[in-house]
Every structure is written in structure tokens, then in C-alpha cells.
Regions:
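Active-site neighborhoods and metal-handling regions in enzymes and metal-associated proteins
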Residues: 1-376
Length: 376
């Protein structure tokens, strides 16, 4: 990614938490390490603990030993700290101008500036190529999606088999709760070596807040929104899916909302393709809801209607560019995005349906295979 206006790229982070660093190295580590690309050649600084693993796993040109650099610095009577190791390498390679991500650690940035280096930052996407998924990356995302669907299927079977008693769902004589369904999903995902955080199983009025994770007993004849977005511990890639179900009978307004959200999703499927403006897709869906009488805005002191974006990119992060929203942004082939319109009203509940798709030159390829059924 080098350009004439800088000599080196520098990232200092833990690749387990920094998607850009993992993308650049394909090396997963829990502790921070130094990555630098100097005029096209990629180096890592690694401790004795991780150096052999890095040499065998990391997709880089050279792995440098921090302990060896520390010895070299000590002979120069320079403190053997990371900043001075970077400085020593950059002096040898005649580096003056450095590109860093916008979350670069301040302490290192300040130290490099004091040593006379010029720093430039870059907004996301730091690596432009992350926007476009290779077939290998798509296969990894799809693998995580299949695991997600298997976990959700197990949860749906439990909801389906539950009994209705006094307006609540029961299994084996005990109330069926949001927490119980989340546990079923998360444990099943662990069997597939997938890690789920903040899984959503919300019910009734809780559904009106799209990011409410849900709690307490699940109710009969009310909307239940399940939103599951795990990361594969093996590959690092996320999947994302949402469905809405009702155990029992949905009220007429909720049925209409479900129908409209499905129609909105179909509008998204038809419009998404290489070169389309994401805001056109989002606005067309919003207009469809408005036309059918489902308004968006403050109602009784709460945001209700369709008040979030239609979709977002998915990859090494659960939310990454591009966005399909009211903000203009060109969607391009080989991007993986969600299509997840929703409608939310306090007097009826919430509905969201989310599929994961690959954008192609002429349309989309849907990675989601799970059936959409409202009433169980």
C-alpha cells in the first residue's frame, strides 16, 4: 500500500483485537507487537515467546527478534525499549515519513515525533483491499454463517416446542427466558469454535430498541428478535443474521410489519449491485414503509419506525465499511454486506430480518439459507 509520500507503514497493536494488523499478518496474538512495512518489505518485531510461531505462521517478509535488537541498543548505551528498536531499524532503512492508523498509540506517536519523524494518519479502511473480499474470505464468512444458522436452528426448535401458559412460554415446567435461549445459541456456537458476544434475544417492547439484548421470560403472541453475530476463533471472520418469530399468534399490525420488512429486504436484494449508491437502496426501503403508513420518528417520546441503516460490511469486524444507509456511499462487487431492514413500534413490537450477501457485478449472492417464518 506504499505511496511516494511516505516511507513506511507502522502498526503497534495486538492482532487479536486489531483487525487491520491481523489482516496484514494473518498472525493472531493476544499481546501487542510491532508491524512495519518499509517500501514494500514487511517486518515484525517479536518477543522470544512468540518469535518461532510468528516465523511459521505470519505472512511477512522478515521476523525480527526484540531481544537481539535490545542487545544492539545496549551496546550503543540506548534504553532497549520498543520505540528505540523502531528508531534503530528506521535509521538503518533511512525512513523519515511514516503512515499510521488513526488509533495509533499516542505514547509511540509522541516519541516518534520527538525523534524527528513525520507521521501521517489514515482513516478506515486503512487497507483499502479489506473492502473487497476474496473467494477464500467469502468461504470463511460463509462457514461462520453456517455455524450461526445451526445454533439459531437449535434455539428455534426450543421456542417451537415450548408450551404457552398465562401468556408466557414454558419448557419442562419452567419459564423460557431470553437468557436460556442465548445460552443455547452461545454454547452451540462454542461447539463450532465460534465466539458470540452480545447475542440478542429480545421480546415484545424490548424489541423496539434494536440493540436491547433482552432479558426475562419470553412471551406468547409477541415478537421475539434473535440477532446473532459470532466470530470464528479459527479464521477470525464474522457472520451476522437476524430473524423475528412469534410463538402463538401475531397481532395484525405485527403481521403487516413482518410482511413489509420482508418486502423491504427484497427491494434491497433487487437494487444492490456493483456501483449502486447505498443511500438509494436504503431510501427506497424507507419510502416503501412510509408509503404503507409506517412512519418513522419520535412517537410517545421514543424513536419508532425504521430508524437504523439497512446494512453494513462484515468481515474481520462485525461492523466495517461499506454502509448501506442514508449516507451516500458506492457499493462495489466483492463486498459482503448485511441487508437488515426493520420496523419497531411500542404498540406492536419489533421486526428485523437480516441476511448476509455478497455483492456481484449484476446483483447479489445470498449467503443466508435459513427459512423465514413468523409464527411458530
Amino acid at each position: 500500500m506504499n505511496q511516494p509520500n511516505y516511507d513506511a507503514v507502522l502498526i503497534i497493536a495486538a492482532s487479536e483485537k486489531d483487525a487491520n494488523l491481523y489482516y496484514a499478518t494473518r498472525f493472531l496474538a493476544p499481546d501487542p507487537f510491532i508491524y512495519t512495512e518499509i517500501r514494500g518489505k514487511i517486518y515484525l518485531f517479536m518477543s522470544d515467546l512468540e518469535i518461532d510461531r510468528a516465523k511459521s505462521e505470519a505472512k511477512v517478509d522478515e521476523v525480527l527478534s526484540t531481544s537481539e535488537f535490545a542487545k544492539r541498543l545496549q551496546t550503543k548505551k540506548v534504553e532497549p525499549v520498543s520505540l528505540n528498536m523502531i528508531d534503530l531499524l528506521y535509521q538503518e532503512e533511512k525512513v523519515k515519513e511514516i503512515l499510521v492508523p488513526n488509533n495509533f498509540p499516542f505514547i509511540y506517536g509522541e516519541g516518534l515525533l520527538k525523534k524527528g519523524y513525520r507521521l501521517m494518519t489514515k482513516e478506515e479502511p486503512f487497507f483499502e483491499s479489506r473492502l473487497f473480499k476474496t473467494e477464500e474470505e467469502i468461504a470463511k464468512i460463509e462457514e461462520t454463517q453456517r455455524c450461526t444458522e445451526a445454533a439459531v436452528e437449535e434455539a428455534i426448535h426450543v421456542i417451537e416446542r415450548s408450551r404457552i401458559e398465562n401468556g408466557k412460554l414454558y419448557v419442562n415446567g419452567k419459564p423460557l427466558t431470553s437468557e436460556a435461549i442465548k445460552k443455547i445459541i452461545n454454547v452451540k456456537l462454542m461447539e463450532f469454535d465460534c465466539i458470540a458476544e452480545h447475542t440478542i434475544v429480545s421480546c415484545a417492547k424490548d424489541c423496539v430498541d434494536p440493540h436491547n439484548q433482552g432479558s426475562g421470560p419470553l412471551l406468547a403472541n409477541e415478537s421475539i428478535v434473535l440477532d446473532v453475530f459470532p466470530r470464528s476463533a479459527k479464521t477470525g471472520y464474522f457472520a451476522d443474521m437476524t430473524l423475528t418469530v412469534v410463538k402463538g399468534k401475531a397481532n395484525p399490525k405485527l403481521k403487516k410489519m413482518y410482511q413489509l420488512v420482508k418486502e423491504g429486504q427484497e427491494i434491497g436484494f433487487k437494487l444492490l449491485k456493483d456501483g449502486v449508491d447505498g443511500s438509494v437502496v436504503h431510501n427506497r426501503i424507507a419510502e416503501h414503509f412510509e408509503k404503507e403508513g409506517f412512519k418513522t420518528g419520535q412517537i410517545d417520546g421514543r424513536m419508532q419506525g425504521f430508524f437504523h441503516g439497512t446494512g453494513h460490511g462484515v468481515g474481520l469486524e462485525i461492523h466495517e465499511p461499506p454502509r448501506v444507509s442514508s449516507v451516500k456511499q458506492t457499493i462495489q462487487a466483492s463486498q459482503v454486506v448485511t441487508v437488515e431492514p426493520g420496523l419497531y413500534y411500542l404498540d406492536a413490537g419489533g421486526v428485523r430480518i437480516e441476511d448476509l450477501v455478497v455483492v456481484t457485478k449484476t446483483g447479489i449472492r445470498n449467503l443466508t439459507k435459513f427459512p423465514k417464518v413468523l409464527e411458530l
